Amino acid sequence: MYSTESRQLNRAARSSPRGAYFFSPCIARANPPYQEEVGDGGNKTYATPIYNKFIEGAYKLSDKVELIHPARFLFNAGSTPKQWNREMLSDPHLSVVFYEASSSRVFINTEIKGGVAVTYHDRTKDFGAIGTFTPYPELNAILRKVRPAMDGKALSSIAVNSYSYHFTDALHRDYPEVEGMLSKGHAYDLKSNVIEKIPQVFHKEKPGDGEDYIQIYGRVQNARVFMYIKSEYINNVVNLRKYKVFLPAASGNGGLGEELASPLVMGPGVGSTETFCSIGAFDTEAEAQNALKYIKGKFARALLSVLKVTQHITPEKFTYVPLQDFTPASDIDWSQPVAGIDRQLYAKYGLSDEEITFIETHVKEME
């Protein structure tokens, strides 16, 4: 398929994740640099992606371009601009010729969340837009059945992101010293370490002073905890006074069908730090328990894997997970165990035996 020269160029381009370029009159091949050495604002935990700029530049230089680069944008994930992601996924001249979820198989001892891909862009050919990318034909087939039946109703519509809960001006009025104790620019954020940073505003036990208190679910020294805080110090998020399912905002590494780390139902009057995101704003605990069963099931987590290719969990990751009716009027019998619920969902969406086997063998069972 490739000439000797092409194979040599491909081997060289894959030799290092730091970047290499090869151009010929007919085709440009490259392994562009992936990110800046220094992160955003000096934040060493974040590095700004730049490979998208090199991809744009390569397309201007040649009609035919073959590149190896991080694959996150194929799932509309990562830190490349969302508009750029959508443009790439809508480009009929772009095709994916190789995908590897485990980057260390391509670049030894190098972890690139979301894997790496080799893409081929040819301005003279129409491959059809990628649209929604998955590396599994079986999952593509399942998506083709599920998406029309969703009628635009996804679990993402009732998901609440991990950044929803914030401090109010009332807290800063009563505790003016707090701003100086928190990171610059984050005086209103409930960061994962906020309970340890400003312990004076939290209480292990509910004070008996007659004030209205809520609980904040967070972590202290790697242990999950509930701490009381005056309700006026926290903004009124849509599910604060409702039942919901909390789950970690980061779980696993983005592999197909991996378990979610200890999701659980929370009642009214419980919010969270940025360690957790949530699903639902339910009137009853039974609805929340049904939603928890759904999330634990293999069907829902298989579809979550379409967009969850890193550890991060955001509402958008649930875009291809169908929203269900979690009330007693549902077409699903939620009294069944999780495996029985999955069987009902397979039938509801008309999955074939092969598609069911794919889910059952690729998605891990949760307790």
Where are these regions (language model features)?
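SAM-dependent methyltransferase catalytic region
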Residues: 1-96, 102, 124-128
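C-terminal substrate-recognition regions of SAM-dependent nucleic acid methyltransferases
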Residues: 23-24, 103-273, 280-332, 336-353
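Short secondary-structure boundary/capping segments
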Residues: 81-84, 113-114, 366
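Conserved beta-strand scaffold positions in the cores of enzyme catalytic domains, especially
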Residues: 96-97, 320
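Short, amphipathic C-terminal "tail helix"
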Residues: 354-367
